[in-house]
Amino acid sequence: MDFKLTSKYKPTGDQPEAIKELTEGLKRGDKSQVLLGVTGSGKTFTMANVIANVNKPTLILSHNKTLAAQLFEEMKDFFPQNAVEYYVSYYDYYQPEAYMPSTDTYIEKDLAINDEINKLRLSAVSALLSGRKDVIVVSSVSCIYGMGGPVAMRNNVIKIKKGEILDRNIFLRRLVDALYVRNDIDLQRGNFRVKGDTVDIAMAYSDNILRVTWWDDEIDAIEEVDSISYHRLGTFDEYEIYPANLFVTSKEQTEIAIRQIQDDLVKQIDFFNESGDSIKAQRIKERVEYDIEMMKELGHCSGIENYSRYFDGREAGQRPYCLLDFFPKDNLIIIDESHVSVPQISAMYGGDRARKRNLVEFGFRLPAAFDNRPLKFEEFHNLIHQVIYVSATPANFELKESEGVIVEQVIRPTGLLDPEIEVRPSTNQIDDLMEEILKRAEKHERILVTTLTKRMAEELTEYLLNHDIKAAYIHSNVVNLDRIKIINDLRSGVYDVLVGVNLLREGLDLPEVSLVAILDADKEGFLRSHRSLTQTAGRAARNVNGKVIMYADSITESMQKTIDETLRRREKQLEYNAQHHITPTQIKRSIKEILPTKNISMGTNIANEKMKLQKYDIPSEELPMVADPIIMKMTKVQLEKSIQNTTALMKEAAKNLDFLQAAQYRDEILRLQAELEQK
């Protein structure tokens, strides 16, 4: 089936030319292209048109789950007759296994899986396994993490036909091989039950139940029924049942894997003994032998993913299978907000390996644990057939990949201008901000506020709540489904103000937002770079009254570049509006539930009562030293002292396995050293 785009709109402004150029590039065989599209110019609509034109299975990669959910919703609206799927991490909570030698502390893996997202992941893989070409998968960086191989998955697909002669017990064994669990009492997703000649299967990737009925050894009927009412939804002459888990294997491969694990265990014990580390040798012996016994008895063990190389039949160092392996070779990858997504992909491997190094070196895991990992960037890049990098601020990598040729989309079909930017002094910035909030709340408009740290976001939210302002916050400690719900609540008026740190920048489609307030805009650094400021300001570009207020005591180079670029785009849009007699019109977008969520709150709890702030356990955060413009006036001695202090902080963070913080300290050191060299 081909892609069929459904929309009441036609491409306008820069969109027709952008769609034409990107489509021609793909049909010409260009590997890499860049779509430079400003906020509100309809990049998603352009992407949908290109997908429909080239008719290829497509992976859309987003750098966070919230934006992935938003893209998923929009693509489902554009392609209601095609398979639009969602593939992100299914953890509501995840504490990875770790060991800190400085305190001799071992941290057991702890997690909570979201069953709804797990269903969507399995649905995405099932759609690709089905062989249909009209598949769009919207994914986070989870698409580069290891999973079972496509061959093993296909071998465990169960194909049945009405009228087929098939012994029921053989069918039940095949269900078990596909990791379905028999439960005749409570039929949950991924279970099956047997009642006489009828087998009900609660498919892991669907909300419905497949009912297969036998007459002797012949399949008499195949029906899909509602999981609650058991009303028949449809009948089938043939059906494919896909595995209930993304990691499946055969009994034969399990036996081979166990033998290989035993061989590698002997080698690792010998290695530790030869090094004089008898404690490590004993530790690895006890842990792995226990895991092997569990595999023999139950077919699995805790942390079985660390043995995935053996079950996949991979060599040491060979990359794991990932979602991309399930796509046909002639596919299309669209990397949204590429200036953030590409560096994120690059960083995944290093962080994973650093954590596992201690586990392997101290005898908690075999070296094979290193091979349960995300792809290296080079491996991901080698899997790309054709790619479109999408960003309002593409980075040097994307420009180099496309050989400097970019498709520009800066005209908004709605006629909306880039928001005006006003710089105000930081003195009394909170009082000034509250005045602006109250003005817009009276007009039923929404406000975004960005701070520099998570703690500042929480404290500002609490302050606003204490002054009877409907406010909430989102940051990285807030789980995915909570973030999605709070954004919908902001749009629907449950909240007037949303406070955040780094999650309010790229891609959020919030036409109700008329004001973006950037606190401490002059604190030069990652969160206040030219790209970050441009992206943050863009959140107000979907509202006819859009405005940005930067609170700062000086205008940094990044601020000036953002202001200048905004003025250039405003002039271009004004010229277009005048030529086509367009009056800027407010974007109206329906508010709908992106993913099924429970009645949960994100930061605040509103139920006809006073809102209460939900606190997260956030460690003390420091602003980057180099964010302070005073470093330009520091003496040579002061710079050397700062480098020394920051190096100590970096080592301490690395020792505590806080690699993100350590990387930030490393970047500070490099900038301090660069400043020192100029003295």
Question: What label would you give each PLM region?
Answer:
Residues M1-L36:
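Conserved pre-motif I regulatory segment
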Residues R28-V34, K56-P57, K133-V135, E445-R446:
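Pre-Walker A (Motif I) flank of P-loop NTPase domains
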Residues R28-V50:
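Walker A/P-loop
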Residues V34, Y87-D432, E436-E442, T461, ...:
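N-terminal cationic and glycine-rich segments that engage phosphates or anionic surfaces
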Residues P57-A69, Y86, K280, R440-E462:
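Conserved strand-helix element at the start of the C-terminal RecA-like helicase core
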Residues P80-S89, G303, R446-L448, L460-D482:
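Conserved RecA-like helicase motor-core motifs
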Residues V151, T453-H475, R671, E675:
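Conserved helicase motor "Helicase C" RecA-like lobe of SF1/SF2 P-loop NTPases
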Residues V478-G500:
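Conserved helicase ATPase core of P-loop NTP-dependent helicases/translocases
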